[in-house]
Design a protein with these regions (language model features):
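Short, flexible cytosolic linker that couples an ABC transmembrane/permease module to its adjacent nucleotide-binding
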Residues: 38-40, 150-153
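Conserved switch/coupling elements of ABC/ABC-like ATPase nucleotide-binding domains
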Residues: 143-151
Length: 153
């Protein structure tokens, strides 16, 4: 299921420092496919990765390594990596937690667009009330149990 139906976005990005942005984005598919299938599909995978990278606004940074990217750019790279497998659901763990409020809002706008345009379900963990109120539904947990379920305003 992971790497097919689910994409993961982490607070701390988890980009591989020795790989370029493009290589980080295609890494999940390199793991998914056998060597034979990888080589047969590599051109299509490369084209799809570039399309996604451009969609998240990083087309000009495609050959850069994570150390050459800002926090917001690294989070956009992580989102691109999560999208490469064409998941139905994105699981986002504090995707704005390491970002300033302006960049965090840019990431939220990008995620909202993905939800609306691509009909992706996004399940997000956050402690930030300003971020939570942008969701369609808010589920609050306490001590590992569902406390409330509300439609957002």
């Amino acid at each position: 299921l992971r790497n097919r139906n689910f994409g993961f976005i982490f607070q701390s990005y988890h980009l591989l420092p020795e790989l370029t942005l493009l290589e980080n984005v295609v890494a999940p598919l390199a793991i998914r496919y056998s060597t034979f299938h990888w080589w047969r599909r590599r051109a299509a995978i490369h084209d799809r990765a570039i399309e996604i990278i451009e969609k998240v606004g990083l087309g000009h940074r495609i050959k850069h390594r994570p150390s050459e990217l800002s926090g917001g750019e690294m989070q956009r790279a992580a989102i691109a990596r999560a999208l490469i497998g064409q998941p139905r659901v994105l699981l986002a763990d504090e995707p704005t937690g390491n970002l300033d409020s302006t960049t965090g809002q840019e990431i939220m706008t990008l995620l909202a667009s993905l939800n609306e345009v691509q009909q992706l379900t996004i399940i997000m963990v956050t402690h930030d009330e300003r971020i939570a109120c942008q969701a369609h539904r808010i589920v609050r947990l306490s001590e590992g149990r569902v406390e409330t379920v509300n439609q957002a305003a």
